[in-house]
Amino acid sequence: MKKLKINYLFIGILALLLAVALWPSIPWFGKADNRIAAIQARGELRVSTINTPLTYNEINGKPFGLDYELAKQFADYLGVKLKVTVRQNISQLFDDLDNGNADLLAAGLVYNSERVKNYQPGPTYYSVSQQLVYKVGQYRPRTLGNLTAEQLTVAPGHVVVNDLQTLKETKFPELSWKVDDKKGSAELMEDVIEGKLDYTIADSVAISLFQRVHPELAVALDITDEQPVTWFSPLDGDNTLSAALLDFFNEMNEDGTLARIEEKYLGHGDDFDYVDTRTFLRAVDAVLPQLKPLFEKYAEEIDWRLLAAIAYQESHWDAQATSPTGVRGMMMLTKNTAQSLGITDRTDAEQSISGGVRYLQDMMSKVPESVPENERIWFALAAYNMGYAHMLDARALTAKTKGNPDSWADVKQRLPLLSQKPYYSKLTYGYARGHEAYAYVENIRKYQISLVGYLQEKEKQATEAAMQLAQDYPAVSPTELGKEKFPFLSFLSQSSSNYLTHSPSLLFSRKGSEEKQN
């Protein structure tokens, strides 16, 4: 029998062509064999979130927020870039998962039995309760029993809808509410303080942050107990992303990174003071504009708004302030400190601010390098208040009591112990008013949060006013001015009149405001 002569070159070419044709349909090519592999092949972790002071926000174009920072670190952990998509409300977030437009939802979402039926939860990292809010001065409900849809509105996709339904079925049959499909919880809280809405429901942490800028928002009652907060991902047979999240959070917890991030965003305390916050925000409007140039001039290693918060805590922005112990001026410097800094007049605002910054920089330079960069300021401020030697004692005490002396979250818990004899008697530098240093730093952080949020709100309002003006008075060509389609001369005369009389300018008036008055 004659042997068949095989043309290996022909077979090789044929096999290559067939492989090229079928390659995209092969499972390990057309798509990665698991979700983590797909993310790494794409080189991008897609995270959807909402814009709030806690989850994700931007200042001067730089993103920040608890969920953003954690998501960025998780992307780094996977070795990919982070892509953030901001949605308006929770319902839109879950649409992103359903439509395959997101790998993760990182937006302070609450774990509950309904959500986990359709979505995969990740590890929990803090907890919140759902609370009913109202405007100070308005009627405060003590129960949900008589609330109607005309009074209570909640955001779409809000976890509390399930809780409300349960309460309606079990306790309050007359309870009713409305869901606003176009607004998130933050916008609904704004509607409450503007008098457009009687009540809404939001989580306790979001409310606490909102009150720093809008102290007129008040909590009427708790709707739920504490609920864990988590991230969500698609629910299917692929658990690789869930496993990676678990490993990531375990690592963050073990090395203390998670505690430091939570301290940064959640460690400001929840002891909200309505009068103090309102007084501070009034001072922001009345006093800060004159001092802002000085804060901006001398703030070097820190943000000027933090410097302003420090000065307010020291003197309430009073250059003539004097304490019973003899400290004076905007930054409340002692006579000896002022002399060492070359300050000739402690009541001169510029000299005081300049000296205070230099003294704070000296404290910053003494903080050990082992302390994380973004926490060094809190150690320095505590030292600024009670003396650097006592800060050394606080760190030593933290280490002795099995805490981390480089973690502000751990050290601040030990500060009040510096005034208790069983502890200070065993320390190198003895008694110190550690509880005052603790309150000092916490107050500064609260003022900083209020100031940053309030200035952002002002900027937002100015932008909206400018956009409204552009809509009310659109640009027209010179040839159109003579056709009386645009009241140009009237606009100029009214603007000039308003400027000269210092009355509210048209630049910040809505179209038709005069019509409403008539």
From Swiss-Prot:
Where is this protein localized, as stated in its record?
Cell outer membrane
Q: What is its EC number?
A: 4.2.2.n1
Catalysed conversion reaction: Exolytic cleavage of the (1->4)-beta-glycosidic linkage between N-acetylmuramic acid (MurNAc) and N-acetylglucosamine (GlcNAc) residues in peptidoglycan, from either the reducing or the non-reducing ends of the peptidoglycan chains, with concomitant formation of a 1,6-anhydrobond in the MurNAc residue
Give the way it sits in the membrane: Peripheral membrane protein
Q: Which residues does the annotated region (Non-LT domain) include?
A: 22-269
Molecular function, one GO term: peptidoglycan lytic transglycosylase activity
Record GO cellular component, one term: cell outer membrane
Keywords, in A-Z order: Cell outer membrane, Cell wall biogenesis/degradation, Lyase, Membrane, Signal
* Pfam families, per database record: SBP_bac_3 (PF00497), SLT (PF01464)
Q: Where is this region: LT domain?
A: 270-518
Highest taxon of source: Bacteria
Q: What class of enzyme is it?
A: lyase
Q: Which GO terms describe its biological process?
A: cell wall macromolecule catabolic process; cell wall organization; peptidoglycan catabolic process
Give the signal peptide as a residue range, or say none if absent.
1-21
Catalytic residues, per the record, are 314
Family per similarity comment? In the N-terminal section; belongs to the bacterial solute-binding protein 3 family.
Q: What does this protein do?
A: Murein-degrading enzyme that degrades murein glycan strands and insoluble, high-molecular weight murein sacculi, with the concomitant formation of a 1,6-anhydromuramoyl product. Lytic transglycosylases (LTs) play an integral role in the metabolism of the peptidoglycan (PG) sacculus. Their lytic action creates space within the PG sacculus to allow for its expansion as well as for the insertion of various structures such as secretion systems and flagella.
Q: What is written about domains in the entry's comments?
A: The N-terminal domain does not have lytic activity and probably modulates enzymatic activity. The C-terminal domain is the catalytic active domain.
PANTHER family in the cross-refs: MEMBRANE-BOUND LYTIC MUREIN TRANSGLYCOSYLASE F (PTHR35936:SF32)
Please identify the protein, giving its name as recorded: Membrane-bound lytic murein transglycosylase F
Q: Give the organism, scientific name.
A: Escherichia coli (strain SMS-3-5 / SECEC)
**Record lineage:** Bacteria, Pseudomonadati, Pseudomonadota, Gammaproteobacteria, Enterobacterales
